[in-house]
Design a protein with these regions (language model features):
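Helicase-associated low-complexity regulatory tails and linkers flanking the ATPase motor
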Residues: 8, 12-14, 79-80, 100, ...
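A short beta-strand element within the Helicase C-terminal
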Residues: 373-386
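Pre-Walker A (Motif I) flank of P-loop NTPase domains
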Residues: 52-56, 87, 360
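Conserved pre-motif I regulatory segment
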Residues: 1-56
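Conserved Walker A/P-loop ATP-binding site and its immediately adjacent core
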Residues: 87-109
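Conserved Walker B
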Residues: 212-214, 369
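Walker A/P-loop
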Residues: 52-72
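Walker A/P-loop NTP-binding motif
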Residues: 69-83
């Protein structure tokens, strides 16, 4: 997979900053000079939230390929550091869902992410989970000096002192060799044993990549980042906090120009939940007909998927989802076309949604997909909240924005995404969708409310 033009520009921005950093030996001065060269000196105020550590941010909208950018950023950062530097990376993620997805892609030698890293580091790469690190699996003083070591970890597993967090602070005989080789730590972590995993990572002085970094700005998060003793911190987010040192901005227009996202979002309102259900089925079937025509013309396979955002009573109760499954089956949908994905039920585990053999066309959820789940085939978000309830779509909207095959399709309807709702306050729903777009790095210009009741698919790219 090649970098898109805007992604090449992001890596070029990082590389130029690193050149200035090596010239000035001052990360704040390098940041100021970088933005002076860009004729934007007002952006050059560096905010030193981690004293002594360069801390930069890529601002990239949802669907812009933040993970691939991070993979491409590792080599330039280490190239700018002394050649004797141990090549260790801590890759922090905010949720178990994103953790699972990131580990899977980085461990897969056939995945574009891993292939890029393998090319940059001569295939001398090892990717670790926290448990593998605690067990010392292929993790020892010799291996870390001979390879790039990527440790994929969740914020919570190091941010707190709960049962899971404590394991990283405790004496660990599996890592005793490190303590002998590395010696006394220069920056000891309070209450951490010298053989503790957290202390060992601290002494490796890693590059820290913070995915969805807007989640990592609490005092606990900053303490965690400090304890990692990073040599460099790279933040990735669509919505940076005001204290972020943004080194490269990606505009939504650039994503649209490179055919990365399905925009605009077409929003339909219906009088009843039952109408949302039936119209979602009709809309998805019509999209699948367009997808079949696209396949005949271009050979690119797409199987449009609809996400039903159910509204449970209180907690995510199984009865709500099973009732919706029954309603879909009563409407003629085969059982194998339906999957439930909630906090407690995961029928998508080990399912390859992009495979032509996969039958899934409808996914029932609440907010379990709000982070860490990506499927470009997801085209429709259908909210089944009560008419009087607020339609909480902003957290899950980003799941339907990625464009399959990252190319413009000949069928215009396949280049857009769709939301159906039965809200009594349609304007409020639209504003929530706009908020969701803002959270993903887009704007209200990317939302198209449709007032007419007849369900029609766009026939051209201008809606």
């Amino acid at each position: 997979m090649e970098l898109k033009r805007y992604q090449k520009a992001v890596i070029a921005d990082l590389t130029r900053y690193l050149q200035l950093l090596n010239q000035t030996r001052n990360y704040a001065a390098a940041f100021r000079l970088f933005w002076q060269e860009k004729s934007a000196p007002s952006l050059g105020h560096y905010q030193d939230i981690l004293p002594g550590v360069p801390n930069l941010c890529f601002k990239v909208p949802t669907g812009g390929g933040k993970t691939f950018l991070a993979c491409n950023a590792i080599r330039p950062v280490f190239d700018a550091l002394p050649v004797t530097k141990t090549k260790a990376v801590v890759w922090l993620v905010p949720s178990d869902a994103i953790l699972t997805q990131t580990v899977k892609s980085l461990k897969d030698s056939n995945h574009d992410y891993r292939q890029k890293i393998d090319v940059d580091f001569g295939s001398r790469v090892e990717v670790y989970t926290k448990q593998e690190l605690l067990n010392g699996q292929n993790f020892n003083p010799t291996s870390v000096t001979e390879q790039l070591s990527i440790m994929v970890l969740s914020y919570d597993s190091f941010r707190g002192r709960g049962k899971e967090g404590l394991k990283a602070y405790q004496e660990n005989s599996n890592l005793a060799q490190f303590a002998k080789v590395l010696g006394k730590p220069e920056n000891p972590i309070q209450d951490a044993d010298e053989t503790a995993l957290f202390q060992i990572i601290n002494q490796l002085n890693p590059l820290v990549i913070v995915d969805e970094s807007h989640h990592a700005r609490s005092s606990l998060s900053l303490e965690m980042l400090t304890n990692f003793n990073p040599c460099f911190v790279l933040d990735l987010t669509a919505t940076p906090k005001k204290e972020s040192n943004i080194i490269s901005y990606v505009d939504a227009v650039q994503l649209k120009a490179e055919h990365m996202v399905k925009l605009p979002v077409i929003v339909y309102n219906r009088d009843k939940q039952s109408e949302v259900l039936i119209d979602t089925i009709d809309l998805r079937r019509n999209l699948e007909k367009r997808a079949e025509a696209e396949y005949q013309k271009t050979g690119k396979y797409i199987r449009p998927i609809a996400l039903f955002q159910a509204q449970p009573k209180g907690k995510e109760d199984a009865a709500t989802f099973e009732k919706l499954r029954d309603e879909l089956k009563n409407a003629g949908i085969p059982a194998e076309h339906i999957a439930i994905r909630t906090a407690d039920v995961n029928e998508l585990k080990n399912v390859d949604l992009l495979s032509p053999e996969c039958p899934v066309r409808y996914i029932i959820t609440v907010n379990a997909l709000k982070e860490g789940w990506d499927c470009p085939f997801a085209y429709i978000l259908a909210s089944l909240a009560n008419k009087t309830s607020q339609v909480d779509v902003e957290q899950i909207l980003g799941r339907i924005l990625r464009l399959p095959h990252t190319c413009q399709h000949t069928q215009p309807a396949l280049n857009m995404s769709y939301v159906l709702t039965s809200s009594a306050n349609f304007n409020d729903t639209v504003q929530r969708i706009v908020k969701g777009l803002n959270n993903a790095g887009f704007s209200e210009r990317d939302c198209r409310p449709v007032s007419y009741t007849h369900l029609t698919l766009p026939t051209n790219s201008r809606v």
